[in-house]
Regions:
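Feature recognizes metal-dependent phosphohydrolase scaffolds
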Residues: 1-272
Length: 272
């Protein structure tokens, strides 16, 4: 059995609940398809949970792919790390990530910092620029979690089996079987809109809400979306009041199931 989850977005309780339904015995394994941070209130704890899980079972049984939110977080860290190492502020600063986080009540950054460190940032935020806040925050996070940051940096962008490609957003399907040779990070991490139709391998991805007009076109739809051909999309809107989905692939039967509350429901093409 191959399990898959995506777009956990800081929701540790939902992750732990889903993992109670996962059996990693025998040849079973699980693939996490990115976006573990932001929006929810437990981003660090989600990352730590996955890191510990992978250390326990190994990288072959627990595959942790990178999502666009992890990459934005890393871009922000790297930009301000360069400011310190170069001794100059003449560089392009990546403020999109931290501005978005502050819009959500600093839900992510606060989980990486102690209360004392967060109080300090809130204090200087009254008079200092976002650049100053970022410089201080990055130094604190690197000091606290250098090994964890390295682990996030090493996350692969896709996982491939003989018949499947697990990825956060998608691949360049126009390239056919040569998709990996010209695959850009932007496509793998941020492809939009979601692709439907026939491909030579099955694509399992997250990144999007399956309720979107490009997929189910139904605001109430928060299940795995199967286009009836080559694409399974795991809904990415748990933080909006949806549910964290668990997909399971039976390698012997070649069938996909949505696992919920201990029950496995066969994934039919959307609309059937």
């Amino acid at each position: 059995m191959i399990y898959a989850m995506s777009d956990i977005h800081g929701c540790i309780g939902e992750l732990q609940k889903n993992m109670e339904q996962v059996d990693l015995g025998g040849d079973n394994r699980i693939v996490f398809c990115g976006d573990y941070i932001d929006y929810g209130d437990s981003s660090y704890y989600v990352l730590k949970y996955l890191w510990d899980l992978q250390k326990k079972y190994g990288t072959e049984k627990v595959v942790v792919l990178k999502g666009n939110h992890e990459q934005m977080f890393l871009d922000w860290i790297e930009d301000y790390r360069n400011i310190y190492s170069d001794g100059t502020e003449d560089c392009m600063t990546f403020n999109d990530w931290i501005c978005t986080d502050f819009d959500y009540g600093a839900n992510t950054i606060s989980t990486f910092l102690s209360k004392q460190q967060m109080d300090f940032l809130n204090q200087i935020a009254r008079t200092c620029s976002m650049e100053t806040i970022s410089r201080e925050a990055v130094q604190m996070i690197i000091s606290n979690y250098e090994k964890l940051i390295w682990w996030i940096q090493q996350m692969p962008l896709y996982f491939e089996t003989k018949s499947q490609i697990f990825v956060h957003a998608g691949v360049d399907e126009e390239a056919g079987e040569y998709w990996m040779w010209g695959a850009s990070d932007n496509t793998l991490l941020g492809k939009f809109p979601a692709t439907k139709g026939k491909f030579y391998k099955t694509i399992i991805a997250g990144h999007v809400g399956t309720c979107s007009r490009d997929l189910a076109a139904d605001r109430s739809y928060h299940d795995v979306y199967y286009d009836g051909e080559s694409h399974y999309y795991i809904d990415g809107s748990v933080y909006k009041g949806g549910k964290l989905l668990l997909l399971a692939y039976d390698e012997e039967k070649g069938e996909y199931y949505q696992v919920e509350n201990g029950r496995m429901a066969f994934v039919n093409p959307a609309g059937i």
